[in-house]
């Protein structure tokens, strides 16, 4: 997210605590927060999709649901053509 938008979120939060927000500012704050949260969720999802879990012996123990997502995206050498990947 653009640093200016994050600064605006913080500015609105401070103003809300000190003097309150106008109805327009409340709408702006809600939109900015939603945009921030969506970006955060997208980043976490991307990070989790890139994880490969292995046990002490080096065996892949990644949950099947995550493996399927990785197959669809071609991550970690997983392929839709190879269900064992």
From Swiss-Prot:
NCBIfam families: PRK02539.1. Residues 62-85 are annotated as: Disordered. InterPro entries: DUF896. The keyword Cytoplasm applies. The keyword Acetylation does not apply. This is UPF0291 protein SPH_1589. Belongs to the UPF0291 family. GO terms for cellular component: cytoplasm. Keywords: Cytoplasm. Pfam families: DUF896. It is found in: Cytoplasm. It comes from Streptococcus pneumoniae (strain Hungary19A-6).
């Amino acid at each position: 997210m653009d640093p200016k938008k994050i600064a605006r979120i913080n500015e609105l939060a401070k103003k809300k605590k000190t003097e309150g927000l106008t109805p327009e500012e409340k709408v702006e704050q809600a939109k900015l927060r939603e945009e921030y949260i969506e970006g955060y969720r997208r980043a976490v999802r991307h990070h989790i999709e890139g994880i490969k879990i292995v046990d002490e012996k080096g065996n892949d123990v990644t949950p099947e649901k995550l493996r399927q997502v990785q197959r669809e995206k071609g991550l970690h050498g997983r392929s839709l053509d190879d269900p064992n990947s």
